[in-house]
Swiss-Prot record:
It comes from Homo sapiens (Human). The keyword Transmembrane helix applies. This is Acetylcholine receptor subunit epsilon. It is found in: Postsynaptic cell membrane; Cell membrane. Residues 21-239, 292-306, 481-493 are extracellular. The chain crosses the membrane at residues 240-264, 273-291, 307-328, 457-480. It is a multi-pass membrane protein. InterPro entries: Neur_chan_lig-bd, Neur_chan_lig-bd_sf, Neur_channel, Neuro-gated_channel_TM_sf, Neuro_actylchol_rec, Neurotrans-gated_channel_TM, Neurotransmitter_ion_chnl_CS, Nicotinic_acetylcholine_rcpt. Changing V285A: In CMS4A; slow-channel mutation; increases gating equilibrium constant by 25-fold, owing to increased opening rate and decreased closing rate; no effect on the choline dissociation rate constant. SUPFAM superfamilies: Neurotransmitter-gated ion-channel transmembrane pore, Nicotinic receptor ligand binding domain-like. Glycans are attached at N86, N161.
């Protein structure tokens, strides 16, 4: 007994469903009998079909800088009026919306003009919604790959302006007129609409502005009806954190190592050149990585590339400086003569200006033990040669100091033994050689000090050049910001 009411209800439901289906089928036959999807929905040939357009961005997939290609995922909302599809829901069981395949209805054939892969149309032919009163809505999804001219001047602190240009493929400006859609509040949606709930944020790019504009042009024919383009500008700003962590910070640290070459001794020119050249090679690797990322263009040089070239120039100058300092430090008095002016500037003036400590003074040697005077040695020699007692020789020496000479003493000096003369000559030679070696050592030490002074000067010059140059290069990126355009942000906070 309990199953009977249940069966009756099920039968009534099926009958009701069948009646509803018949009404929809009847509406379909009513609308599409003698309907031609190839003709425009106008009563007169000179009438214009008004197309309301709305573009909703769901995902900014990527921007390939190398190929200058922007890949986006969008929904294209298209609304228009077709008087041939006009009906009243009261005549067809209260049906407000009829869904029909898109190939059965006239379409404005909107395509993306600046696509790069030849896919002008949409990705999926969704059904067309026909509403009471002849209003038609088509909302197909599409994945577009469009051309985007990449400006690499401030890479990786750059922003790009990529455009999506829509137009009707077969209809001119007199046959089809484009307008922007309006929201529920009656405001015109003259920008790319972004649904924050469905939008997937890109990890590399942030969208700042996405205004739209409708432009009518003649396409080269001044007397023709012209064409209408709907241009959406997608102004995106790069998020530079990835490049700062993986390229800029390692590059700055490696470039700073070239300054450590100045902390090596001036005579270690080979080691200093090795350090500088290794840094130069590392910078070349970073420059190669950047060249693989940016497009092959000669219009501008990227900011990071300018920084690497600048640091490579500094490293090259440091290598040249190391060679010059090594050449100066290895000079000797036999090959080069030091001018007094150069000595004054590099050894006296510049150390005082740079605050360098003066060279340490050589410790004074302790006074040697008192030796016998040369007069005593001569007296002993005369005593042996002349066979005279020491008292007489001393007396003759006193007379010599008083200005009187004896012929015997002069004859004794003339007849001095050859052995004594050889010893005196040897002593004089040793003394003269010692004086020459001391003078040569002092001059060699002056050349080494001059090399150290040049090294010190070049260190401060390289430090100032590296710091100021790097700051000026990256300071340009700070001022490269998206201009304050008179548009509302795409993504409202």
């Amino acid at each position: 007994m309990a199953r009977a009411p249940l069966g009756v209800l099920l039968l009534l439901g099926l009958l009701g469903r069948g009646v509803g289906k018949n009404e929809e089928l009847r509406l379909y036959h009513h609308l599409f009998n003698n309907y031609d999807p190839g003709s425009r929905p106008v009563r007169e040939p000179e009438d214009t079909v008004t197309i309301s357009l709305k573009v909703t961005l769901t995902n900014l997939i990527s921007l390939n800088e190398k190929e200058e290609t922007l890949t986006t995922s969008v929904w294209i909302g298209i609304d228009w009026q077709d008087y041939r599809l006009n009906y009243s829901k009261d005549d067809f069981g209260g049906i407000e919306t009829l869904r029909v395949p898109s190939e059965l209805v006239w379409l404005p054939e909107i395509v993306l003009e600046n696509n790069i892969d030849g896919q002008f149309g949409v990705a999926y032919d969704a059904n067309v919604l026909v509403y009471e009163g002849g209003s038609v809505t088509w909302l197909p999804p599409a994945i577009y790959r469009s051309v985007c001219a990449v400006e690499v001047t401030y890479f990786p602190f750059d922003w790009q302006n990529c455009s999506l240009i829509f137009r009707s493929q077969t209809y001119n400006a007199e046959e089809v007129e484009f307008t922007f859609a309006v929201d529920n509040d009656g405001k015109t949606i003259n920008k790319i609409d972004i649904d924050t709930e469905a939008y997937t944020e890109n990890g590399e790019w942030a969208i700042d502005f996405c205004p739209g504009v409708i432009r009518r042009h003649h396409g080269g024919a001044t007397d023709g009806p012209g064409e209408t383009d709907v241009i959406y500008s997608l102004i995106i700003r790069r998020k530079p954190l990835f490049y700062v962590i993986n390229i800029i910070v390692p590059c700055v640290l490696i470039s700073g190592l070239v300054l450590l070459a100045y902390f090596l001794p001036a005579q270690a020119g080979g080691q200093k050149c090795t350090v500088s050249i290794n840094v130069l090679l590392a910078q070349t690797v970073f420059l190669f990585l950047i060249a693989q990322k940016i497009p092959e263009t000669s219009l501008s040089v990227p900011l990071l590339g300018r920084f690497l070239i600048f640091v490579m120039v500094v490293a090259t100058l440091i290598v040249m400086n190391c060679v010059i300092v090594l050449n100066v430090s290895q000079r000797t008095p036999t090959t080069h003569a030091m001018s007094p002016r150069l000595r004054h500037v590099l050894l006296e003036l510049l150390p005082r200006l740079l605050g360098s400590p003066p060279p340490p003074e050589a410790p004074r040697a302790a006074s040697p033990p008192r030796r016998a005077s040369s007069v005593g040695l001569l007296l002993r020699a005369e005593e042996l040669i002349l066979k005279k007692p020491r008292s007489e020789l001393v007396f003759e020496g006193q007379r010599h100091r008083q200005g009187t000479w004896t012929a015997a003493f002069c004859q004794s000096l003339g007849a001095a033994a050859p052995e004594v003369r050889c010893c005196v000559d040897a002593v004089n030679f040793v003394a003269e050689s010692t004086r020459d070696q001391e003078a040569t050592g002092e001059e060699v030490s002056d050349w080494v000090r001059m090399g150290n002074a040049l090294d010190n000067i070049c260190f401060w010059a390289a430090l100032v050049l590296f710091s100021v140059g790097s700051s000026l290069i990256f300071l340009g990126a700070y001022f490269n910001r998206v201009p304050d355009l008179p548009y509302a942000p795409c993504i409202q906070p």
